[in-house]
Amino acid sequence: REDYLAADHVAPSDYAIQHRGVVETHLSGLRLTRERRVVISYFSMAPYLLPGTDLIFTVTRHYAEHFAEILPLAIIDSPIDYPVVQFYQLWHERMQHSPTHRWLRTLVGEMRRSRPGPQPA
């Protein structure tokens, strides 16, 4: 665990002081910190920064497996148990009854339910 925390990490920038990412929030609750060597504005940039480095990017297994299929990346279990990440669909109230928007929300929900792993509540 100490090696993991001391290693160089790629981390997304905090949304705001009171709105940090899942990893930082969880570590803070455990009174732990990690070495945030590279801070990025766009989460999707991180996997492309990793090949050829010893940088660590802590993400969900599903996300890691997707990028390991297209980039030379190693997936290693974290020595710290992180909570299950919950994803939500949010939309403006004026789109609530839009047929095309309802279709898209249904499609996204069906795709999520068809994937292995923890399911939404």
Regions found by a protein language model. Name each.
Residues 4, 48-51, 89:
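Hydrophobic residues within well-ordered alpha-helices
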Residues 10, 15, 40-43, 79-81, ...:
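Short, solvent-exposed coil/turn elements at secondary-structure transition points
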Residues 10-12, 58, 90:
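Short hydrophobic segments within beta-strands
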Residues 1, 6-30, 97-101, 105-106, ...:
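Secondary-structure junction motif
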Residues 15-75:
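Hydrophobic hinge/microswitch elements
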Residues 63, 73-117:
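A late-sequence structural motif
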Residues 7-8, 34, 85-88:
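Short amphipathic alpha-helical segments
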